[in-house]
């Protein structure tokens, strides 16, 4: 995608097909429920930041699936089911995945919020210094505390192994009990900030 084509995009559906990495699209990282006149369209600089962030998200997706999805024990032993019952349930699951266009058994990483324009950031109550404004941050959906901790551990291990820097890894929980992982990587000046936060 060229810089000039980014400037002409005006709707999130037009962003959906633009790939930032093998498993993440520009549409995923720019989606918002906030209705603003600017359409939440990132600049070419923001897109480069999102690509850098997606490099980490690809590592997270790959390692999480290798460790916790693809190498699970035989579920029939754990669930006390006969293999026939489990097999019919697995077939049903596979058919529904196929209907969604998924040809693998891997679990996706789901992004709640990525890039935010100033108008979107204001509409959702984001802080003025948010890494979302520059395309350097993503809020990642998790199913609960266990997945939150596993995601955080994978990203911390990757940083330790490679020496790659990140800015923020925030394990967040709101008043209603929902968890998510806020993760940010800047082009430079990363702080390696790790916190548990209640919002």
How would you label these PLM feature ranges?
Residues 4-5, 10, 27, 72, ...:
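Serine/threonine-rich, low-complexity intrinsically disordered segments
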Residues 1-65, 192-199:
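Extracytoplasmic cell-surface/polysaccharide-interacting catalytic and binding patches
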Residues 124-140:
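Active-site microenvironments of hydrolase-like enzyme catalytic domains
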Residues 64-72, 105-109, 164-173:
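Short glycine-rich, low-complexity/disordered patches
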Residues 61-65, 100, 156-160:
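N-terminal cationic-hydrophobic initiation segments that often serve targeting/anchoring roles
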Residues 134, 142-199:
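Catalytic cores and adjacent binding grooves of peptidoglycan-active enzymes
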Residues 54, 58-67, 107-125:
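Extended, low-complexity, intrinsically disordered C-terminal regulatory tails
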Residues 73, 79-84, 91-106:
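A cross-taxon signal for low-complexity, glycine/charged-rich
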């Amino acid at each position: 995608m060229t810089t000039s084509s980014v400037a002409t995009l005006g709707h999130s559906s037009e962003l959906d097909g633009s790939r930032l990495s093998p498993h993440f699209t520009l549409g995923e990282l720019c989606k918002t429920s906030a209705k603003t006149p600017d359409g939440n369209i990132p600049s070419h600089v923001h897109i480069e930041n999102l690509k850098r962030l997606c490099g980490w998200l690809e590592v997270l997706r790959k390692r999480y699936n290798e460790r916790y999805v693809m190498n699970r024990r035989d579920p029939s032993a754990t669930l006390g089911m006969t293999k026939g019952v489990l097999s019919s349930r697995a077939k049903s699951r596979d058919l529904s995945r196929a209907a969604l266009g998924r040809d693998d058994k891997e679990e996706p990483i789901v992004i709640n919020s990525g890039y935010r324009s100033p108008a979107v950031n204001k509409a959702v109550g984001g802080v003025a210094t948010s890494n979302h404004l520059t395309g350097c941050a993503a809020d990642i959906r998790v199913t609960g505390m266990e997945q939150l901790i596993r995601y955080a551990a994978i990203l911390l291990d990757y940083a330790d192994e490679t020496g790659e820097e990140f800015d923020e890894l925030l394990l967040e929980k709101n008043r209603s009990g929902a968890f998510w992982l806020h993760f940010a990587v800047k082009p430079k000046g990363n702080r390696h900030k790790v916190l548990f936060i209640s919002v």
